Structures are given as structure tokens and as C-alpha cells.
Amino acid sequence: MSRIGKLPIEIPKGVKISYTDSNLQVVGPKGTLSRTIMSGVTIEMTENHISVSRDDDGIKSRSAHGLTRTLINNMVTGVTKGFETALEINGVGYRAELKGDVLNLSLGYSHPINFSLPKGINVEVDKMTKILVKGVDKELVGQTAAKIRDFRGPEPYKGKGVKYADETILRKAGKTGKK
């Protein structure tokens, strides 16, 4: 039995969950999420708990058991609290600006980068060097933050580029020069 998969998921007040034909829909105060549940996994719902169990001990069922429980837990957390990821921009002339649902980035290239935000993602820009990506879907928040970081990842010599707020960059020593 999966250690993570056997834990029940508590349903907070204000969250409604419907499960029909392997489709799970979670509705909460911050929004709605839906996901198709993998085969080999069964979901049992009570008034305030959801439990996930597997149909057999096959490899696919065992691997999907804990994953399914975690995905459902992330859906419940997303519609109640939401998820956010913070990014920082370091470098001379590097800045971010939000215009509508387009994030304009100046990252040292000869052209500005215009990044259209996906549906369901909100971005806040503070002091043109801090970006906060918010949303209900944990996977989409993380993917959007990773795409923004990929435009110019931090380089190891001066640390210029876009990095996660809690990320530490391993710095390299520069050339030592001939004496």
C-alpha cells in the first residue's frame, strides 16, 4: 500500500466535488478544476473525506495510487488557497512590465519579449524586478514560472537573469589573469 495514497483527503467547507465516469471536478471559492482519473484507481467519497484505493497490485495501479491522491489534494488546495511562485530579475536594464494579460520582459536581448499569460494565471509585478505568478492549478503555475525563467536563466558568474526567489545560484570564479 502506498504511504501517500492511503492517507484520506479532507474536504474543507465551501468545496464541492463531483466524480462521474473517471472525471473529477472540484469547485471552490477560488475557481474550478477538473481532471481525468487514471484507470486502476478507485475513489470513495464521504461527506468530508476522499480516499483513493487501487484495484489491483499491478505496476500501473501501484504507480498511479499515490500520484492520484496527490493530484486530488493539490486540486482541493488550489481551489481553497491557490498557489504562487515568486521570481526575481537581476541585471542592469533587466525589467518586467505587465500590460493586460501580456508580460513584457526586457532581458538584455536586442528585442523585448512579450509573453502571453495562459488562462487562469494572474501575475503581479513589483518594482519591475519581482514577478509573482498566481493561480489555482499548481501544474500550470509551475509551468508558467518555468517558461518565464527559461527566457534568460541565471548565469553563474554575475547571477544575471531570471531566478526563483528561493533559488541559490552557484557562483563561479572569473578568470584569474596572467601575472
Curated annotation (Swiss-Prot):
PANTHER family: 60S/50S RIBOSOMAL PROTEIN L6/L9, LARGE RIBOSOMAL SUBUNIT PROTEIN UL6M. The keyword Lipid biosynthesis does not apply. Belongs to the universal ribosomal protein uL6 family. The lineage of its organism: Bacteria, Pseudomonadati, Thermodesulfobacteriota, Desulfuromonadia, Geobacterales. Part of the 50S ribosomal subunit. It comes from the Bacteria. The keyword rRNA-binding applies. This is Large ribosomal subunit protein uL6. GO terms for molecular function: rRNA binding; structural constituent of ribosome. One of its GO terms (biological process) is cytoplasmic translation. HAMAP family: Ribosomal_uL6_B (MF_01365_B). GO terms for cellular component: cytosolic large ribosomal subunit. SUPFAM superfamilies: Ribosomal protein L6 (SSF56053). This protein binds to the 23S rRNA, and is important in its secondary structure. It is located near the subunit interface in the base of the L7/L12 stalk, and near the tRNA binding site of the peptidyltransferase center. Keywords: Ribonucleoprotein, Ribosomal protein, RNA-binding, rRNA-binding. PROSITE patterns: RIBOSOMAL_L6_1. InterPro entries: Ribosomal_uL6-like, Ribosomal_uL6-like_a/b-dom_sf, Ribosomal_uL6_a/b-dom, Ribosomal_uL6_bac-type, Ribosomal_uL6_CS.
